[in-house]
Curated annotation (Swiss-Prot):
<dbReference type="GO" id="GO:0022625">
    <property type="term" value="C:cytosolic large ribosomal subunit"/>
</dbReference>
<dbReference type="InterPro" id="IPR036373">
    <property type="entry name" value="Ribosomal_bL17_sf"/>
</dbReference>
<comment type="subunit">
    <text>Part of the 50S ribosomal subunit. Contacts protein L32.</text>
</comment>
<protein>
    <recommendedName>
        <fullName>Large ribosomal subunit protein bL17</fullName>
    </recommendedName>
</protein>
<keyword id="KW-0689">Ribosomal protein</keyword>
<dbReference type="InterPro" id="IPR047859">
    <property type="entry name" value="Ribosomal_bL17_CS"/>
</dbReference>
<dbReference type="GO" id="GO:0006412">
    <property type="term" value="P:translation"/>
</dbReference>
<dbReference type="GO" id="GO:0003735">
    <property type="term" value="F:structural constituent of ribosome"/>
</dbReference>
<dbReference type="Pfam" id="PF01196">
    <property type="entry name" value="Ribosomal_L17"/>
</dbReference>
<comment type="similarity">
    <text>Belongs to the bacterial ribosomal protein bL17 family.</text>
</comment>
<dbReference type="InterPro" id="IPR000456">
    <property type="entry name" value="Ribosomal_bL17"/>
</dbReference>
<keyword id="KW-0687">Ribonucleoprotein</keyword>
Amino acid sequence: MRHRHGLRKLNRTSSHRLAMLRNMSNSLIEHEVIKTTLPKAKELRKVVEPLITLGKKPSLANRRLAFNRLRDRDSVAKLFDVLGPRFANRPGGYLRVLKFGFRVGDNAPMALVELLDRPEVDETENVQEAE
């Protein structure tokens, strides 16, 4: 029986799984929205939400804990300088996982993972800049 095992193995070794989730976390923090498979997205939520909670309390110890998990200075800086203050009043649930259809090659269920309260990008400004 597999009672109380809260982790999906995702058909990977533990080191590969750790590296994959670390890379996906860094990508999500940098771009604020990523597209991946649904099981990976659900596991990513378990990794990123505690990191954002760490970012809400800016201390040296929390920065070191976040760096230990992310291993990227730019991601840690954004986590504490941008995302922590943005989610200061939200008690949890910082991510949204949206089902995004199925992948063409293998029909794997896809998902869009995004941070909530993202600043809206005005598309008319982008069109004017392109012209």
